[in-house]
Every structure is written in structure tokens, then in C-alpha cells.
Design a protein with these regions (language model features):
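Extracellular and organelle-lumenal recognition/adhesion modules and their flexible linkers in secreted
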Residues: 28-188
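Intrinsic low-complexity, repeat-rich intrinsically disordered segments enriched
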Residues: 1-39
Length: 188
């Protein structure tokens, strides 16, 4: 089944590992053990999008790769042309919460004939040692929660997906963007 990804000029941003179904920017990604320990440290390195050693903007993206914010991969399969930037925040709830940078993905040329296998997503890959505190693979494995800020040019339902590459398992959870051009904090 084909789906519409948007019009030229629309901006699409999603959290780690999710497929883009909306538009906007995102920052402040964090995954912590779901026991919700006060002040638990995020398991995501550069979730605040502060580090962009490759540069702060790349235009005319049509292939997968690491373009701006370190550790965040942009994956694409026949889905138009994109620009990715590391944005500086100066206002809004995410800025007020202490975030000064975000990753932004802008659809500059839409693909008018998407097929079922076409996609655009932003992914973050953990290394095994990064997840040791979750006791993955044991009877005492801990649950996790993913919290992030998102700002979109369109409202609607989006999907965050976690994929276990070692065991070829995945879990998806939806979240809703309620207001356009407004930073919203989501926990899934």
C-alpha cells in the first residue's frame, strides 16, 4: 500500500528508529529504565543534539547516511529529497526545559508516487554495553520509557519503534502531535 509522505516544503522529524509520518523537529531524546528512578541518566548519547561534527546542515539528501547530529542516522528509500539541519533553539517549551539544539528534517521535494517499501526514518543504534543496566536477555530485564520533545508542522499520529537487531524483534508505540508548530513532550 502506498502512502502520502507530504508536499514539497513539508518538514518531517521522528524519534529514534521511527518512520516519519509527520513533520517538524525533535530534540531531547532520552531512554531510561522504566522504574523511573529520579534523575536517571539517559541511555542515548547526544540525545540533546549538541554535537554535530559532520556539519550543521546538509541539503539535497536522497540516500541514507549520518549528516548532522552525531549518532543519528538518516535512512531513506526512494522517498523524495530532504534537508537535515542542527537547529538552534531560542524559545519554546523544549528551550525552557534546557534544550538549545534540535535535529530538523525538511522534505524539499516530495515523491508523488511512493510505494509500500519507501520510507524515511531517523535511527539511533545502541551498543550492547550501553544497555547492560537494563539486564536485557535475563529474567530480570527492565522495562524502558522513551521521552522526547517534538515540534511538527502537522498534527497526527506518529510511531516510535524499537528494534532488537540481535533477536529480530520489534515493538511499536504511537504518540500524537496535538498542535502545529508547538514543542510537545512525549513519553512512550
Amino acid at each position: 500500500t502506498a502512502f502520502a509522505l507530504g508536499d514539497s516544503g513539508d518538514t518531517f522529524t521522528v524519534p529514534s528508529g521511527a518512520t516519519i509520518v509527520n513533520s517538524g523537529t525533535a530534540t531531547g531524546f532520552g531512554i531510561t529504565a522504566a522504574s523511573f528512578r529520579p534523575n536517571a541518566q539517559s541511555l542515548i548519547i547526544n540525545g540533546d543534539m549538541q554535537v554535530a561534527q559532520r556539519g550543521t546542515s546538509t541539503a539535497s539528501i536522497t540516500t541514507s547516511g549520518f549528516y548532522t547530529c552525531d549518532r543519528w542516522n538518516f535512512s531513506i528509500s526512494s522517498a523524495g529529497t530532504w534537508t537535515q539541519t542542527q537547529e538552534s533553539l531560542t524559545s519554546g517549551d523544549a528551550f525552557a526545559d534546557g534544550f538549545s539544539k534540535s535535529i530538523k528534517v525538511d522534505n524539499t521535494t516530495a515523491d508523488a508516487s511512493l510505494s509500500a517499501g519507501d520510507y524515511v526514518k531517523i535511527t539511533y543504534k545502541f551498543e550492547g554495553q550501553d544497555l547492560q543496566l537494563l539486564k536485557k536477555g535475563t529474567a530480570n530485564a527492565e522495562k524502558i520509557a522513551v521521552g522526547f520533545w517534538v515540534k511538527a508542522t502537522k498534527t497526527g499520529t506518529n510511531i516510535l519503534e524499537l528494534f532488537d537487531n540481535s533477536n529480530t524483534r520489534q515493538v511499536s508505540q504511537s504518540y500524537t502531535v496535538s498542535s502545529t508548530d508547538t514543542w510537545e513532550y512525549k513519553v512512550v
